């Protein structure tokens, strides 16, 4: 984990201010992570440029913020929630890259700019999503957390990732016989990673 040390926001009187401070912590750490991709070598530059392109595209960062706040509620050290925040956002970003591909939703735009496959090509985008899925677990493994905490985090992360993928499978099939079935699909696609962020942060 990075040598950078963070502290919880001092004032909890205004939600928007706390949210912004959590986001600022996350964005600073994410910049460090994306910079570290350069260490993987020039021959993988296209892969990690695409991964960084999507990771740094913005978004609300609800999942990292949730990990930080659950850590605070549980009385933890925010620095121990950083691996959870980064890993969950990597998985979320991988899912968005794949979701935008022509074989899925075929979306040309994501967060106000060309989607990953439009900017970097379909093959590289597919591999960038795969790389982020793998890197999420690696990031936790490489952290300074105790071994048992790493194991618990990784299990939670990939259990929930599988649930998210199963939800996307239902969406791809496009057959919803009942409202409950439709809601179940949305629940799996969205709530699985929100749950992961909450559990991993605590």
Residue ranges, per PLM feature:
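N-terminal amphipathic/basic leader segments beginning at the initiator methionine
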Residues: 1-34
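Short, N-terminal intrinsically disordered low-complexity segments that are rich in Pro/Gly
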Residues: 12-20, 36-41, 55-56, 126
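Mg2+-dependent prenyl diphosphate-binding active-site environment of isoprenoid biosynthetic enzymes
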Residues: 25, 31, 41-202
């Amino acid at each position: 984990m990075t040598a950078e040390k963070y502290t919880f926001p001092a004032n909890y009187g205004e939600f928007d201010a706390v949210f912004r401070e959590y986001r600022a912590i996350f964005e600073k750490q994410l910049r460090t992570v994306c910079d570290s991709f350069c260490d993987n070598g020039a021959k993988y530059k296209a892969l990690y440029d695409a991964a960084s392109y999507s990771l740094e595209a913005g978004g609300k960062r609800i999942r990292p913020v949730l990990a930080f706040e659950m850590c605070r509620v549980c009385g933890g050290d925010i620095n121990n929630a950083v691996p959870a925040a980064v890993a969950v956002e990597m998985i979320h970003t991988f899912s968005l890259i794949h979701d935008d591909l022509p074989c899925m939703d075929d979306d040309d735009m994501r967060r106000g700019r060309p989607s990953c496959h439009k900017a970097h090509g379909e093959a590289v985008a597919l591999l960038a999503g795969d790389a982020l899925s793998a890197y999420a677990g690696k990031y936790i493994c490489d952290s300074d957390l105790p071994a048992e905490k790493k194991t618990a985090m990784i299990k939670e992360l990939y259990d929930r990732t599988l649930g998210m993928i199963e939800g996307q499978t239902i969406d791809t099939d496009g057959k919803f016989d009942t409202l409950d079935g439709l809601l179940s699909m949305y629940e799996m696609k969205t709530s699985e990673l929100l749950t992961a962020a909450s559990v991993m942060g605590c």
